[in-house]
């Protein structure tokens, strides 16, 4: 029991170290290297959150993931390509390390969520994230979640893995509902908090 507690403490510590590095990465100039570094660190945090901060549901092999609130934040900060990479790489490596095989249907859903949320970030803009922008974000992420887990994941499950339609769509609907709620609450909080660290253009006055 003590070993498990120590293990989780170490994991939390490592996540905070990665977040600190991400903060430094954000200050780098907008280059391809910056995005690759953000993608790699984001994928590592994705795996930790998926493995240790997942909430079980009554539907088999389906959990509620706080991970996607983090993916939404990263996609808003770094754009669609980074969101896509974190979703794809993070979910793939998490499947391999946790289950020994990759469910490409759910990898595709995670990757699409990151990609689409990145484009949503370009429309909504992270600066001054409040009021109408929060409403647009929530509406957008609900639509993206529905496409990701009620359309993409079940259809690929049925087409490639020959999963029963009822089971595939039950898993998809459960995941979509859970993820859209988590992202609407925690994702909004994370993006709002981050937006407060950004200095708006024209907000600095010359002394």
Outline where the language-model segments fall:
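Loop-helix junctions at membrane interfaces
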Residues: 2-207
């Amino acid at each position: 029991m003590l070993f498990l507690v120590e293990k989780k403490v170490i994991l939390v510590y490592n996540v905070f170290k990665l977040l600190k590095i991400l903060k430094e990465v954000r200050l780098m100039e907008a280059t391809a290297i910056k995005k690759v570094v953000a993608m790699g660190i984001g994928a590592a945090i994705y795996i930790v959150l998926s493995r240790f901060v997942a909430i079980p549901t009554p539907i088999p092999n389906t959990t509620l993931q706080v991970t996607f609130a983090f993916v939404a934040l990263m996609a808003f900060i770094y754009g669609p390509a980074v969101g896509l990479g974190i979703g794809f790489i993070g979910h793939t490596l998490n499947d391999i390390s946790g289950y020994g095989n990759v469910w490409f249907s759910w990898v595709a859903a995670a990757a699409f969520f990151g990609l689409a949320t990145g484009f949503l970030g370009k429309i909504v803009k992270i600066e001054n994230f409040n009021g109408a922008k929060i409403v647009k974000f929530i509406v957008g992420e609900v639509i993206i979640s529905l496409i990701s887990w009620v359309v993409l994941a079940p259809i690929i499950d049925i087409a490639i893995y020959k999963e029963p339609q009822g089971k595939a769509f039950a898993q998809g609907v459960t995941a979509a509902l859970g993820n859209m709620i988590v992202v609407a609450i925690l994702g909004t909080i994370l993006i709002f908090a981050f937006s407060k660290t950004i200095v708006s253009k024209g907000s600095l006055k010359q002394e």
